[in-house]
Each structure stands twice: as C-alpha cells, then as structure tokens.
C-alpha cells in the first residue's frame, strides 16, 4: 500500500498543476477518475478483505486530499456528493461483489474447488444464507477472496 500511495502522490502533482491552470473542476475530476484512482484500485479484489483498517484509511486519505485540492474548504462528504464519487471502500466492495458474481455465473470458469457451494435449505429461514462458507483454519485463508466474498454476500442478504 505504501508503494501505491507513493505512485498516486506523483500523479497528484498533476492535479495541483491543473488546478493552478484554472481547469474546470469537472475536467480535474475526470483526470482523477481516469488516471489516479485506477492506480489505487488495481487488483483491489485480491487484497480488499485482508486489508487492515489503517491501510484502508491511508488510501481513503489520498482521495480526501485530492478532493480537498479540487474543492478547498469543503467537507469530504460534501466533496463526494458534489463530484459524484463514491468512497474507495464502497468501490472495493462493489468490485469484489461484481467479480464474485461473474465467477459464479460464468460456466466456463473452472474454479469448482474454490467456489463455495450454494446452500438450499429445506425450510424458510428469516436470515437464509446463500453460500456455505468453508471452515478455515488460518486467518489468511479466512480473509482471502472466496470465503470473505461468500460471507459478505450471506451477511447482506
């Protein structure tokens, strides 16, 4: 994450230059979403569930800094609303859900050993789970993509 933040900080310099050149806020947001944010979101599905909160906050702090450059003297929540940008955490969750659903629904993917099996109860439950979450012996496997995604989908149903 430190290397990602370092790469992004180099690109933030260009945002400062665009702001000094009086480029419109919409164009700066467009530059941020096309050139800077993809660096922070690259392969985020792999590390999202294993990412400690302090590293997640470090990534979010970078986005907060960019938005404070574009919209000075404005609260972060207001900047997000003004620019139409979601928090990085929300985008990572959406990306993980999208990838998991793509893997589940694509029949050509041969990952039957890794994908948690679906749960079909014989009776109605108030909080039915969609997938059987595998038992894990280590935290590393517990926080990996498939068990965490299955747990996340079960919690949100």
Task: Label the predicted regions.
Residues 1-157:
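Hydrophobic/basic alpha-helical segments
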């Amino acid at each position: 994450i430190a290397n990602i933040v370092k790469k992004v900080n180099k690109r933030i310099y260009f945002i400062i230059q665009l702001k000094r050149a009086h480029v419109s806020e919409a164009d700066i947001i467009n530059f941020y979403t096309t050139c800077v944010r993809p660096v922070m979101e690259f392969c985020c599905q792999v590390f999202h569930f294993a990412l400690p909160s302090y590293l997640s906050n470090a990534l979010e702090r970078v986005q907060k800094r960019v938005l404070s450059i574009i919209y000075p003297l404005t609260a972060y929540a207001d900047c997000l609303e003004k620019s139409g940008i979601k928090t990085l955490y929300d985008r990572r969750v959406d990306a993980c859900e999208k990838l998991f659903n793509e893997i589940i629904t694509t029949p050509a993917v041969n990952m039957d050993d890794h994908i948690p099996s679906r749960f079909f109860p014989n009776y109605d439950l108030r909080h039915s789970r969609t997938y059987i979450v595998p038992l894990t012996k280590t935290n590393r496997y517990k926080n990996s993509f498939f068990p965490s995604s299955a747990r996340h989908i079960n919690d949100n149903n």
